[in-house]
UniProtKB/Swiss-Prot annotation:
Belongs to the 2Fe2S plant-type ferredoxin family. Binds 1 [2Fe-2S] cluster. The keyword rRNA-binding does not apply. This is Ferredoxin, heterocyst. CDD domains: fer2 (cd00207). PROSITE patterns: 2FE2S_FER_1 (PS00197), 2FE2S_FER_2 (PS51085). Residues 4-96 form the 2Fe-2S ferredoxin-type domain.
Amino acid sequence: MATYQVRLISKKENIDTTIEIDEETTILDGAEENGIELPFSCHSGSCSSCVGKVVEGEVDQSDQIFLDDEQVGKGFALLCVTYPRSNCTIKTHQEPYLA
């Protein structure tokens, strides 16, 4: 099983840390396992509480049903159903910027 380095950043929340997450663990679950508290609500990809923005790297969020193609194209990802597919950098706490 592949494991990736996932950097989570949020200037407002004073987060800038890199954690290891395997390909079968969501970004949100990996963060929780490492003691990083990120916002969430549904845990099923059907709301926007946990939305982040992929700045670098590849992810799989094929299970999400909330974001439209334009939002996904801009890099937004629902971290509760997003799996790393490479080393990546993700801005957390992005719900206010989703519009």
